Curated annotation (Swiss-Prot):
Its main location: membrane. SUPFAM superfamilies: MFS general substrate transporter. This is Equilibrative nucleotide transporter 4. Nucleoside transporter that can mediate uptake of adenosine, uridine, guanosine or cytidine when expressed in a heterologous system (yeast).
Length: 418
């Protein structure tokens, strides 16, 4: 490590809370468009009743995101973080706007052609997700834990916000013609605005915050090349004072980083296998008919999102933060008792039990994810933290792909399942 850089930022360094707010907004933007797609799934089920939109969208989205992040994680040390993240948010903005254009062009009618174009736009969301998520997790991993926690909390907040907006729009337009479509259009317009806001914040605000400049200079002093464009955007052109001594910048290879953190990687994989095998497809298609009617699935999704958000903020309370690696593994494995619990509750239980199980699923997903993502980078140099962050995102998306695929098993035995 270059002289003059300590393990922690000076206490009087300005911009920490501003950076936390920006990271939270960036986290919202990284998932808001996709969560909007999931939350307005009731509209797409109305337009495409025979095509399982929620399951198909996730089956398209996640494998593309996984394939993209695997390529980017392999090449992360040679890719400008700034260009990568801005490209992702710009792609989110354009793709979300195209959903509005598509719906206006087709006037909300179904058809296989409309569905194929819709699935193509969903694929672009997967590409944007991997570009943004891996880049930001890697970038924030080399900074203080509060920033990555704020980003992860923002990701959870995206789900909570979309659920609130969906419930409001459904209630507001319930008695009007094309109520679902009107609500969906409002959603997509808000999503487009949020993604554009993220482009502006990351391009012009975030790189100029003192705490961000400090950690990026520190990473550059440890041999990171991915932060050079960000430092230039902050007005730092002369990096001659940073260390170029290779003897001081010996870094672990990706394989070594993965072996040292294999438990964290596998735990993240298992978390998202379980979560995505249940959410959202099971909640839309396997929870039966209840007195709440078509509000039921929306309430379940909202419940998951709110408890997921709560779980992501819980580690801010020190005694609630799990840091013991064995305890984390036990907690992750214990969650798998939820599988039979969901099965029997869907078959024999009432809505109260289902809401409780969904709450547990959301709470544990958010809490365990943030605990792992904040403790994993500890003790590594900046470039190693960036590489590790990208690797962990690979396992998150890998778990999501497997979970989505396993989610189709819930349809076995159902009439008109396929």
């Amino acid at each position: 490590m270059a002289d003059g850089y300590e393990n922690h930022a000076p206490e009087n360094l300005q911009g920490k809370y501003q950076a936390m707010v920006v990271c939270c907004i960036l986290g919202i933007g990284s998932l808001f468009s996709w969560n909007s797609m999931l939350t307005i799934a009731d509209y797409y089920y109305q337009v495409f009743p025979d095509y399982h939109p929620s399951r198909v969208f996730t089956l398209i989205y996640q494998p593309i995101a996984l394939g993209t992040i695997m390529i980017l994680a392999y090449r992360e040390s040679k890719i400008s973080t700034r260009k990568r993240i801005l490209t992702g948010y710009i792609l989110f903005t354009i793709s979300t706007f195209l959903l509005i254009v598509l719906d206006l062009t087709t006037k909300g009618h179904g058809g296989i052609g409309h569905y194929i174009v819709l699935c193509t736009i969903v694929a672009s969301f997967g590409l944007a997700d991997a570009t943004v998520k891996g880049g930001l997790v890697g970038d924030l991993s080399l900074m203080c834990p509060e920033l990555i926690q704020s980003y992860m909390a923002g990701s959870g907040m995206a789900g909570a916000l979309t659920s609130v907006l969906r419930l409001i729009t459904k209630a507001a337009f319930e008695k009007s013609n094309n109520s679902l479509r009107k609500g969906a259009m409002i959603f997509l317009a808000i999503s487009t605005f949020i993604e554009l806001l993220c482009v502006i914040l990351y391009a012009y605000v975030f790189p100029k915050l003192p705490i961000v400049k400090y950690y990026r200079r520190k990473a550059a002093s440890e041999g990171s090349k991915t932060v050079v464009a960000d430092l230039a955007a902050a007005g730092i052109q002369n990096l001659s004072d940073l260390s170029d001594d290779d003897s001081k910048n010996q870094m672990l290879r990706k394989k070594e980083l993965l072996l040292q953190n294999i438990d964290h990687a596998v735990n993240l994989f298992l978390i998202y296998v379980l979560t995505l095998s249940i959410f959202p497809g099971f909640l839309y298609e396997n929870t039966g008919q209840h007195g709440l009617g078509d509000w039921y699935a929306l309430i379940l999704v909202a419940t998951y999102n709110f408890w997921d958000l709560f779980g992501r903020y819980a580690p801010l309370v020190k005694w609630l933060k799990l840091e013991n690696r064995k305890a984390l593994t036990i907690a992750v494995l214990t969650r798998y008792f939820l599988v039979p619990a969901f099965y029997f509750t869907a078959k024999y239980g009432d809505k109260g039990w289902m809401i409780m199980l969904v709450s547990i699923l959301g709470l544990t997903t958010g809490h365990l994810t943030v605990c792992i993502m904040t403790i994993a980078p500890n003790g590594y140099k900046g470039p190693e933290k960036n590489a590790l962050g990208n690797l962990l995102v690979v396992f998150i998306l890998g778990g999501a792909v497997v979970g989505i695929s396993l989610g189709w098993l819930w349809l076995i035995g159902k009439k008109y399942a396929f």
